[in-house]
Amino acid sequence: MKALKKIAGVTAAQYVTDGMTIGLGTGSTAYYFVEEIGRRVKQEGLQVVGVTTSSVTSKQAEGLGIPLKSIDDIDSIDLTVDGADEVDKDFNGIKGGGAALLMEKIVATPTKEYIWVVDASKMVEHLGAFKLPVEVVQYGADRLFRVFEKAGYKPSFRMKGDSRLVTDMQNYIIDLDLGCIKDPVAFGHLLDGTVGVVEHGLFNGMVDKVIVASKDGVTVLEAPKAG
C-alpha cells in the first residue's frame, strides 16, 4: 500500500514545471508528492512556490527547502496535488481524514488544475463508507452534534487522545457515519446551509484529474469538463 501511494505521489510531481505556484496537500499519499517536489528542488533546481494545506505539510515543506507563500499572498495556484479518502464515479470525493479539510478546500478553490493522488482502494461506487468529516465552530458544537444525531447521521467527535481534536483553524470535527451518500451534491448543500458548520469534507465537482495507483500500474482519470 505504501509503495502504491509513493508511485501516485511521484507521478503527480511530473506535472510540476518551473515557475509554478503549487498547492501542497496533506495526508499519507500527498506526503510523497511533497517529498518528490523537495527532491527536485534540491537536485534539479526546480523553481516553485508552495502553498500548504496544514501545519504538518508546512513543516514538511520547510524541512525540504521548498519556498512557501501564504494563501493570502497569491491570487491563483497553477496546480494542487492532494489525497482523497474516497472518490466516486462522478469525481466527487470525501476528504478530511487528516483533519485539514478547511485549508484543503481554501487552497483548492483558486487552483487551475486540481489533482488527487490515491491508491485503488479509494475508488468507490458510492461515497459514505468513509466517515464524512464536518468542521464546526466550538461554540454550539454539542447542540449541532445532537441535531446530527436526531437526523440519523451517527455523529462522533474526532478525538486526539482523551480530548476533542482541535484543527489548525481552532475548530472541532464531527465525523458522520452515513454508510452511503446517495446524492453528495444535495447533501453538501444541506451542510453548507447549516449554521455552525464551517466546512465539510465533500469535494464535489472540484477535481480535474485522479491519479490511481494499483498493483497493475498507474491510471490517470480525467474528470469531464463542466458544461
Curated annotation (Swiss-Prot):
Superkingdom, taxonomy of origin: Bacteria
The EC category is isomerase
Q: Does the keyword Isomerase apply?
A: yes
Gene Ontology biological process terms, A to Z: pentose-phosphate shunt, non-oxidative branch
Q: What keywords tag this UniProt record?
A: Isomerase
Reactions catalysed, as given in the entry: aldehydo-D-ribose 5-phosphate = D-ribulose 5-phosphate
Q: Which residues form a coiled coil?
A: none
Location of the active site: E104 (proton acceptor)
What is said about its interaction partners and assembly? Answer: Homodimer.
Function recorded in the entry? Catalyzes the reversible conversion of ribose-5-phosphate to ribulose 5-phosphate.
Name of the protein this chain belongs to: Ribose-5-phosphate isomerase A
**Native source organism of the sequence:** Streptococcus pyogenes serotype M6 (strain ATCC BAA-946 / MGAS10394)
